[in-house]
Amino acid sequence: MAAIGVHLGATCACAAVYKDGRADVVANDAGDRVTPAVVAFTENEEVVGLAAKQSRIRNVSNTVVKVKQILGRSSGDPQAEKYIKESKCLVVEKNGKLQYEIDNKLISPEDVAKLIFSKMKETAQSALGSDVNDVVITVPFDFGENQKNALGEAAAAAGFNVMRLIHEPSAALLAYGIGQDSPTGKSNVLVYKLGGTSLSITVIEVNSGIYRVLATDTDDGIGGVYFTEALAQHLASEFQRSCKHDIRGNPRAMMKLMNSADVAKHSLSTLGSANCFVDSLYDGLDFDCNVSRARFELICSSLFSKCVEAIKKLLEQVGFTAEDINKVVLCGGSARIPKLQQLIKDIFPNVELLSSIPPDEVIPIGAAIEAGILLGKENPSLEEEALFIECSAKDILLKGVDEMGADKFTVLFPSGTPLPARRQHTLHAPGSTSSVCLELYESLGKSPMNEENKFAQIVLQDLDKKDGLHDILTVLTMKRDGSLHVTCTDQDTGKCEAITVEVAS
């Protein structure tokens, strides 16, 4: 029986199969190993992938892109608000949930993701010639519980049995067998993922086959689309210079340039120059322009600077120098860019830069290997050779009340806490109250707390009123998969309540 791994990115999706002791990415019906995560809705059907991307110019208001950015989010979430503002599809809130309004029909982000997962399932089944149900799905390190659950629900709706959600950096290490090739000794690995809409960097300690995440950081202001946009702006300037028309305010013309710039960007990863030709770009005028790799690197110089500064910042955060890193793993389609690879080599001149697996295939391959391990059919010894110690991606906070009855937040699991982990906290509540509600929140960085951050609550009722304070002992245990068990006990009476917050895996 084969197992598969699926990576649903913001801009692309990819499926890999683990069979006969080997993991490999499978091509879709167009012969491409990576599928655009784009869904177009027409009068008669839903179109997924390259065809949807290519037809977007003619069907922009009915074509959904970057659905991953809104999965599991609600209005008021800064990421969701940014997405809604930029989306060409109308996004509305109905019954407390964000949905696309397309041709007077409401379509949830989960339904869009389901169509992409269905495409991945069809792709894998076509390659194998048999049904595939069991899957491991990758998630970004900073995904919250709501986002994980939404992703898992979408995959299940597509007919998948989701065996596990695995963090993307963990999948990257599995793909290269890091920790298995050197079962003894200690090393530090930096996983560098430059995807379509974000840059994620993670430092992982590998010690005798045990993997522990030391630090991670994600920047949503750097990604492949930003390189494409920079090149498209340059092309618009060239068109204005040669044809005397400024098309920057024309969405249709700029979308055509974005498509051309995207193709050119990919070509420049292997070629010294690329041709950008757009038929009838504006007012019947064709556009034809050559861009050299050197020119592209100059146009995107500020983006390249951000890409390397992010590495230095994370190393400083964890107290490392470049010499403390033993290996660098490249992930994400934009990590193919030669200039970026050279800049990373300049930071780590004596470090092995792992890029033998195409960067946009590393993560799904690792997920497929994990799927094979979980099925236990192909190479069960792998499970004994590598143990991941995951860590909490976000701060987990407990909201209670202080002696004066005011809200008070206490960080119990700071982001980066190795899992599994256990914490306990004694909350002091006014003795005049007969019930205490403790709410759990998750946060990244120093963002202000609001209702959008709450993911669970526990209520301790029927407390005996008393002079002084109630002492409520709260014990939280977070497992490796991110699930959280919480118990609250009144120290005076022993009255206890407990909840478990499961994850989609």
From Swiss-Prot:
Disulfide topology: none
Residues spanning the membrane: none
Cellular component annotations (GO), alphabetically ordered: cytoplasm; cytosol; nucleus; plasma membrane
Keywords of the record: ATP-binding, Chaperone, Cytoplasm, Nucleotide-binding
Compartment(s) where it occurs, according to its Swiss-Prot or TrEMBL record: Cytoplasm, Cytosol
CDD domains in alphabetical order: ASKHA_NBD_HSP70_HSPA14
GO biological process terms on file: chaperone cofactor-dependent protein refolding; protein refolding
InterPro entries assigned to the protein according to its UniProt record, in alphabetical order: ATPase_NBD (IPR043129), HSP70_peptide-bd_sf (IPR029047), Hsp_70_fam (IPR013126), HSPA14_NBD (IPR042049)
GO molecular function: ATP binding; ATP hydrolysis activity; ATP-dependent protein folding chaperone; heat shock protein binding; protein folding chaperone
Function: Component of the ribosome-associated complex (RAC), a complex involved in folding or maintaining nascent polypeptides in a folding-competent state.
Subunit text: Component of ribosome-associated complex (RAC).
Family in the record: Belongs to the heat shock protein 70 family.
UniProt protein name: Heat shock 70 kDa protein 14
